[in-house]
Design a protein with these regions (language model features):
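Alpha4 helix (beta4-alpha4-beta5 surface) of REC/receiver domains from two-component response regulators
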Residues: 74, 89-90, 98-115, 128
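Non-catalytic signal-transmission and effector/linker regions of two-component phosphorelay proteins
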Residues: 1-9, 16-22, 27-30, 121-136
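Short amphipathic alpha-helix used as the core "switch/output" element in two-component signaling
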Residues: 73-86
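Conserved active-site segment of CheY-like receiver
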Residues: 13, 93-99, 120
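His-Asp phosphorelay/catalytic-motif detector in bacterial-type signaling
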Residues: 4-5, 30-31, 56-60, 85-91
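Receiver (REC) domain active-site loop signature in two-component systems and cognate sites
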Residues: 67
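Active-site residues of response regulator receiver
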Residues: 63-64
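Helix N-cap/capping motif at the beta->alpha junctions
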Residues: 36-49, 72
Length: 136
Protein backbone atom coordinates (compact mmCIF):
# COMPACT_ATOMS: atom_id res chain seq x y z
CA UNK A 1 0.00 0.00 0.00
CA UNK A 2 1.33 3.44 -0.88
CA UNK A 3 1.80 5.82 2.02
CA UNK A 4 -0.54 8.81 2.11
CA UNK A 5 2.42 11.15 2.25
CA UNK A 6 5.71 10.02 0.80
CA UNK A 7 8.82 11.21 2.55
CA UNK A 8 11.62 11.34 -0.01
CA UNK A 9 15.28 11.88 0.82
CA UNK A 10 17.56 13.25 -1.89
CA UNK A 11 21.21 12.48 -1.13
CA UNK A 12 23.37 14.48 -3.53
CA UNK A 13 26.16 17.01 -3.00
CA UNK A 14 24.88 19.07 -5.95
CA UNK A 15 22.35 21.61 -4.64
CA UNK A 16 21.15 22.34 -8.17
CA UNK A 17 20.39 18.65 -8.78
CA UNK A 18 18.50 18.47 -5.48
CA UNK A 19 16.50 21.57 -6.40
CA UNK A 20 15.67 20.25 -9.88
CA UNK A 21 14.77 16.77 -8.63
CA UNK A 22 12.57 18.16 -5.87
CA UNK A 23 10.75 20.23 -8.48
CA UNK A 24 10.19 17.14 -10.65
CA UNK A 25 8.88 15.20 -7.64
CA UNK A 26 6.41 18.01 -6.87
CA UNK A 27 5.12 17.86 -10.47
CA UNK A 28 3.69 14.40 -9.72
CA UNK A 29 1.09 15.98 -7.43
CA UNK A 30 1.76 13.27 -4.87
CA UNK A 31 1.68 14.37 -1.28
CA UNK A 32 5.41 14.48 -0.62
CA UNK A 33 7.81 15.73 1.97
CA UNK A 34 11.31 16.09 0.50
CA UNK A 35 14.45 16.01 2.64
CA UNK A 36 17.58 17.13 0.75
CA UNK A 37 20.92 15.99 2.19
CA UNK A 38 24.24 16.99 0.67
CA UNK A 39 26.29 13.98 1.77
CA UNK A 40 26.03 10.37 2.75
CA UNK A 41 27.15 11.32 6.26
CA UNK A 42 24.31 13.87 6.61
CA UNK A 43 21.79 11.29 5.44
CA UNK A 44 23.05 8.68 7.92
CA UNK A 45 22.99 11.22 10.74
CA UNK A 46 19.35 11.97 9.91
CA UNK A 47 18.44 8.26 9.81
CA UNK A 48 20.27 7.49 13.06
CA UNK A 49 18.53 10.34 14.89
CA UNK A 50 14.99 9.59 13.68
CA UNK A 51 13.83 7.90 16.86
CA UNK A 52 15.21 10.47 19.31
CA UNK A 53 14.36 13.54 17.24
CA UNK A 54 11.01 12.47 15.84
CA UNK A 55 12.26 13.01 12.28
CA UNK A 56 10.01 11.65 9.56
CA UNK A 57 11.18 8.31 8.19
CA UNK A 58 11.82 8.41 4.45
CA UNK A 59 9.91 5.95 2.31
CA UNK A 60 12.25 6.53 -0.63
CA UNK A 61 15.93 7.53 -0.78
CA UNK A 62 17.49 8.74 -4.02
CA UNK A 63 21.25 8.24 -3.63
CA UNK A 64 23.99 9.75 -5.78
CA UNK A 65 27.22 7.78 -6.09
CA UNK A 66 29.89 10.42 -6.68
CA UNK A 67 30.06 12.77 -3.71
CA UNK A 68 33.02 14.17 -1.77
CA UNK A 69 33.66 12.69 1.64
CA UNK A 70 31.28 9.78 2.05
CA UNK A 71 30.17 8.74 -1.42
CA UNK A 72 27.19 6.56 -2.28
CA UNK A 73 29.19 3.37 -1.75
CA UNK A 74 30.25 4.50 1.71
CA UNK A 75 26.64 5.36 2.53
CA UNK A 76 25.48 1.89 1.46
CA UNK A 77 28.17 0.26 3.59
CA UNK A 78 27.09 2.19 6.69
CA UNK A 79 23.37 1.92 5.85
CA UNK A 80 23.68 -1.88 5.82
CA UNK A 81 24.85 -1.69 9.46
CA UNK A 82 21.79 0.27 10.62
CA UNK A 83 19.15 -1.40 12.75
CA UNK A 84 16.75 -3.34 10.54
CA UNK A 85 13.83 -1.34 12.01
CA UNK A 86 15.37 1.81 10.55
CA UNK A 87 15.89 0.20 7.13
CA UNK A 88 12.44 -1.40 7.07
CA UNK A 89 10.07 0.18 4.57
CA UNK A 90 12.72 2.33 2.85
CA UNK A 91 13.28 1.94 -0.89
CA UNK A 92 16.80 2.99 -1.96
CA UNK A 93 17.24 4.06 -5.58
CA UNK A 94 20.62 4.98 -7.01
CA UNK A 95 20.28 8.26 -8.93
CA UNK A 96 23.51 9.01 -10.75
CA UNK A 97 25.06 10.33 -13.94
CA UNK A 98 26.91 7.04 -14.48
CA UNK A 99 25.46 4.82 -17.18
CA UNK A 100 28.40 2.42 -16.87
CA UNK A 101 26.98 -1.15 -16.80
CA UNK A 102 29.61 -2.23 -14.26
CA UNK A 103 28.54 0.54 -11.89
CA UNK A 104 24.92 -0.55 -12.21
CA UNK A 105 25.83 -4.18 -11.51
CA UNK A 106 27.83 -3.09 -8.44
CA UNK A 107 24.94 -0.96 -7.18
CA UNK A 108 22.34 -3.67 -7.70
CA UNK A 109 24.52 -6.17 -5.84
CA UNK A 110 23.59 -4.38 -2.60
CA UNK A 111 20.49 -5.98 -1.07
CA UNK A 112 19.34 -2.55 0.11
CA UNK A 113 19.30 -1.08 -3.43
CA UNK A 114 15.98 -1.53 -5.23
CA UNK A 115 16.66 0.33 -8.45
CA UNK A 116 19.23 2.26 -10.49
CA UNK A 117 18.40 5.23 -12.68
CA UNK A 118 20.50 7.82 -14.45
CA UNK A 119 19.99 11.52 -13.93
CA UNK A 120 17.96 13.50 -14.39
CA UNK A 121 14.98 12.35 -12.38
CA UNK A 122 11.81 13.29 -14.25
CA UNK A 123 8.15 13.39 -13.32
CA UNK A 124 7.58 10.31 -15.49
CA UNK A 125 10.39 8.33 -13.87
CA UNK A 126 9.10 9.29 -10.43
CA UNK A 127 5.58 8.17 -11.32
CA UNK A 128 6.96 4.86 -12.66
CA UNK A 129 8.89 4.27 -9.43
CA UNK A 130 5.80 4.97 -7.33
CA UNK A 131 3.76 2.54 -9.43
CA UNK A 132 6.51 -0.07 -9.17
CA UNK A 133 7.22 0.09 -5.44
CA UNK A 134 4.16 1.56 -3.76
CA UNK A 135 0.71 0.15 -4.43
CA UNK A 136 -2.49 2.07 -3.66
Amino acid sequence: MKPEIMCIMLVDDNKNDNFFHEREIKKTHLETYVIPKESGAEALEYLNSMIESGNTKPTLIFLDINMPGMDGWGFLDEYSKLDKDIQSGIIVVMLTTSDNPETKVRAMSWSSVSDYITKPLTKEIMEDLVDKYFKF
